[in-house]
């Protein structure tokens, strides 16, 4: 049974109903409809913390989806799961892959910056200030890209860039 039929959350049910109506009226191929169903089920599982199920759905959606823009969001969500699981190297890989298909994903740049900043903090705790600075510099570059795409967002990152004199 598709996940959309078993979800008890009102907002998810509403989204599923609207998505199903749109799938019926918008001209799409059966493959595109099936890919979207897997994507939607992946989002639902992810929102409930069922990451293994979400990944299965996302991988199936990736197998079926041909549109690069749509694939970018699937890859981004896979990156989110790996981030949540502390698998930062894998997460970065998926964010990069998402950005290759859609370079206008500020949230991917932000998440990459957060991971780099975290790694910089880890390097400081390990007493390696040179490595920490390299990670912080990389975080700064990603945050600048995110802010360029969405001016006015990422205020905390903007403040960090100013405080650390990384803002140009």
UniProtKB/Swiss-Prot annotation:
Q: Sorted alphabetically, which InterPro entries does this protein's record hold?
A: PSI_Ycf3_assembly (IPR022818), TPR-like_helical_dom_sf (IPR011990), TPR_rpt (IPR019734), Ycf3/AcsC/BcsC/TPR_MFPF (IPR051685)
Q: Membrane: is it a keyword of this entry?
A: yes
GO cellular component terms, A-Z: chloroplast thylakoid membrane
| PROSITE patterns in alphabetical order | TPR, TPR_REGION
Predominant location: plastid
Instruction: Output the Pfam families linked to this UniProt entry.
Output: TPR_1
Entry keyword Repeat: yes
Which segments carry the TPR repeats? 35-68, 72-105, 120-153
Q: Quote the subcellular location field of this record.
A: Plastid, Chloroplast thylakoid membrane
The family database entries (Gene3D superfamilies) matched by this protein are listed as: Tetratricopeptide repeat domain
SMART domains for the chain? TPR
Q: List the membrane topology term(s).
A: Peripheral membrane protein
Keywords, A to Z, come to: Chloroplast, Membrane, Photosynthesis, Plastid, Repeat, Thylakoid, TPR repeat
Q: Look up the domain of life of the source.
A: Eukaryota
Which terms under GO biological process does the entry name? photosynthesis
Q: Would you identify the family this protein belongs to, as annotated? A: Belongs to the Ycf3 family.
What the protein does comes down to: Essential for the assembly of the photosystem I (PSI) complex. May act as a chaperone-like factor to guide the assembly of the PSI subunits.
Question: HAMAP family attached here?
Answer: Ycf3
The protein here is known as: Photosystem I assembly protein Ycf3
Q: Species name for this entry?
A: Panax ginseng (Korean ginseng)
Query: What taxonomic lineage is listed for the species of origin?
Result: Eukaryota, Viridiplantae, Streptophyta, Embryophyta, Tracheophyta
